[in-house]
């Protein structure tokens, strides 16, 4: 048996040592790389995501309900002032301050309401940048200042600037906080909370006409309007004191969502709302003057038709909103549009004070839903919830065109036959509301 040469053993040993050294280096390299692996996984699995998501809305509690009170006061001094314009229309028609046609006078209220919607469209991005307090202060100042200037006005142009533009711009600054703050504090109870806040517009539409009617005799027009300005000042201090922006959007919303124009249900509902507001504002502007001019009632009672209508609308803005949480807003707003159209047409047959009061009560209830439900409808039509602010602003901006046209168009129809074409006015208001209801039923 032959023995292996000793050098073979030395070669094998050297090879084994080389292999062991390579294994050691490989193992050392592997071990050295292991601590880095979790870091690589962490950096790829957890990229920076920006600020943490805000907690869900509390849906109650002292702070949340204080914001409902603040929202109530905002609606009290925005839509509440708009709803009271019918009393100013009746007073201006008397010629005590200036002599102008019904259509010219209605431009004051129409511009005021249009400014509310259009300025609200542009101030949405300011709100998104976190300037809630600035909007509240500027809007409150414009409303109070506008009324103080209105108390000094003697001509149509002065009234148009003070009441139409100044008060309207102030209301527009407050409109976005009206509809944007509460959804950050309520989700499951949003309809109820928003309905309670929106009822402030009805309360304003009751109190402001009564104040003007009761004080204009003993104090005159100037001091009566100043008292309205002081009431606005006191009530607007409440939202300035209690309202805070709970959630600041990560970035300011775009002014226009171009995809909305190809969204057929959204555009159909916007068109329907535009037509509904045309008919509704014809009713709000002229029902008081109708009672005095026919004459169905005396002048004093004619002033109270607007507060009666707005008192009923308080229930129309709360009950349907609360029901919308259960059965959906579209199942309510469509029949309300149809009901308003029928009631406006019923004014063609009204010849007694009792009949006029009944129409005012019923149209106030169903008309209140036409103002309270659209924000919920726009929310329901927006699939991408990050675009809610944009879509609400766009929708109300387009609806503002109907508000702008509604009153003056009705005034032009009325003035066609020496301020007596009431048949044409009520047919115009009734048909536009009926068409709006049918569009919602068919297309949305």
UniProtKB/Swiss-Prot annotation:
Residues 48-57 have a biased composition (Pro residues). Disulfide bonds: none annotated. GO terms for cellular component: plasma membrane. The chain crosses the membrane at residues 62-82, 107-127, 134-154, 159-179, 192-212, 223-243, 267-287, 301-323, 330-350, 356-376, 394-414, 424-444. Disruption phenotype: Strongly reduces the production of yellow pigmentation. Residues 1-13 have a biased composition (Polar residues). Glycans are attached at residues 8, 421. It is a multi-pass membrane protein. GO terms for molecular function: transmembrane transporter activity. The keyword Transmembrane applies. Residues 31-44 have a biased composition (Basic and acidic residues). Residues 1-57 are annotated as: Disordered. Induction: Deletion of the conserved eukaryotic csnE deneddylase subunit of the COP9 signalosome leading to defect in protein degradation results in the activation of the silenced dba gene cluster. Expression is positively regulated by the dba cluster specific transcription factor dbaA. Expression is also controlled by the transcription factor flbB. It is found in: Cell membrane. Belongs to the major facilitator superfamily. Monocarboxylate porter (TC 2.A.1.13) family. PANTHER family: MFS-TYPE TRANSPORTER DBAD-RELATED, MONOCARBOXYLATE TRANSPORTER. MFS-type transporter; part of the gene cluster that mediates the biosynthesis of the antibiotic 2,4- dihydroxy-3-methyl-6-(2-oxopropyl)benzaldehyde (DHMBA) and its derivatives. Is probably involved in the transport of the metabolites to the environment. This is MFS-type transporter dbaD. The lineage of its organism: Eukaryota, Fungi, Dikarya, Ascomycota, Pezizomycotina. The gene is dbaD.
């Amino acid at each position: 048996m032959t023995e292996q040469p000793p050098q073979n053993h030395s070669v094998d040993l050297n090879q084994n040592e080389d292999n062991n050294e390579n294994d050691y280096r490989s193992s050392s390299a592997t071990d050295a790389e292991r601590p880095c692996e979790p870091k690589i996984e962490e950096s790829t699995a957890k990229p920076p995501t920006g600020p943490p998501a805000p907690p869900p809305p509390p849906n109650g509690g002292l702070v949340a309900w204080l914001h409902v009170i603040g929202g109530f006061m905002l609606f009290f001094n925005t839509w509440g002032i708009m709803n009271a314009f019918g009393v100013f229309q009746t007073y201006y028609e008397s010629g005590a301050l200036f002599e102008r046609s019904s259509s010219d006078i209605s431009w004051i209220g129409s511009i005021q309401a249009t400014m509310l919607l259009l300025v609200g469209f542009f101030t949405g991005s300011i709100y998104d940048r976190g300037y809630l307090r600035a909007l509240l202060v500027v809007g409150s100042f414009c409303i109070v200042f506008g009324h103080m200037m209105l108390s000094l006005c003697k001509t149509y142009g002065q009234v148009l600037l003070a009441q139409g533009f100044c008060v309207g711009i102030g209301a527009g600054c407050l409109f976005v906080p009206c509809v944007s703050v509460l959804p950050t504090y309520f989700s499951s109870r949003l309809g109820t909370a928003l309905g309670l806040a929106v009822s402030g517009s009805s309360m304003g539409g009751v109190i402001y006409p009564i104040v003007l009617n009761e004080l204009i005799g003993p104090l005159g027009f100037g001091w009566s309007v100043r008292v309205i300005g002081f009431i606005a000042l006191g009530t607007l201090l409440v939202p300035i004191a209690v309202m805070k922006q709970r959630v600041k959007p990560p970035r300011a919303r775009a002014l226009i969502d171009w995809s909305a124009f190809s969204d057929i249900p959204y555009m159909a509902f916007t068109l329907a709302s535009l037509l509904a507001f045309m008919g509704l504002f014809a009713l709000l502007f002229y029902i008081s003057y109708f009672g005095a001019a026919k004459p169905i009632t005396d002048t004093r009672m004619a002033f109270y038709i607007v507060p009666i209508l707005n008192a009923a609308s308080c229930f129309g803005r709360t009950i349907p909103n609360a029901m919308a949480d259960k059965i959906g807003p579209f199942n309510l707003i469509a029949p309300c549009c149809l009901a308003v159209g029928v009631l406006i047409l019923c004014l063609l047959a009204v010849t007694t004070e009792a009949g006029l009061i009944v129409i005012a009560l019923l149209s106030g209830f169903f008309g209140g839903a036409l103002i309270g439900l659209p924000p919920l409808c726009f929310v329901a039509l927006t699939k991408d919830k990050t675009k809610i602010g944009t879509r609400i602003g766009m929708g109300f901006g387009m609806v503002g065109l109907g508000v702008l046209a509604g009153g003056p168009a009705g005034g032009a129809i009325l003035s066609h036959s020496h301020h007596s074409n009431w048949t044409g006015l009520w047919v115009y208001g009734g048909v536009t509301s009926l068409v709006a209801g049918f569009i919602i039923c068919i297309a949305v």
